[in-house]
């Protein structure tokens, strides 16, 4: 096939022409990965693109916003370039996937999708979020939470490896977002510092 669709088994389709919506962007030469709007079962946003450098690494933008909310500057109602998207539902041309050597298996669970998207960006492509393809994501239903000591250790190891691999890019920040945002929040709050 020409396109690959990475799709978690804990998702449920909401919009009927979601695959066509994703292909519309994935077929464009400049586009690497395409991600969708993922909702929690309570109809709040789980994923609408990933902000890079947030919460020290990466975070889902608009997380927990209500489904009908337009988002910061309307970003929940139009397709746009984003730094990364989640592999819970990600489409990419097979040629791009092969060009960057696919997912890095050393990131067993955490950051494998963000690492992949950064490598796609480094290869000269852009990643796109579309709000017109929507799915429910029953997050962590299939793999569970990272609460056991072994899972916690694996997660911490993946965090460290990600920080080492992408230190330069993390320091540069996310060109798709305003550099004045508070990077410790996912809600587009500005980091306002008092004048001295």
Residue ranges and their predicted role:
Residues 2, 32, 83:
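Conserved acidic residues
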Residues 1-14:
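Short beta-strand-to-loop acidic/aromatic patch adjacent to the donor-nucleotide binding site
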Residues 1-2, 28, 102:
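Active-site acidic short loop of glycosyltransferases
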Residues 18-22, 76-101, 105-136:
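A short, conserved alpha-helix in the catalytic core of glycosyltransferases
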Residues 11-55:
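Conserved donor NDP-sugar-binding/catalytic core segment of glycosyltransferases
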Residues 8-10, 34, 93, 107, ...:
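Generic structural signal for small/hydrophobic residues in well-ordered secondary structure
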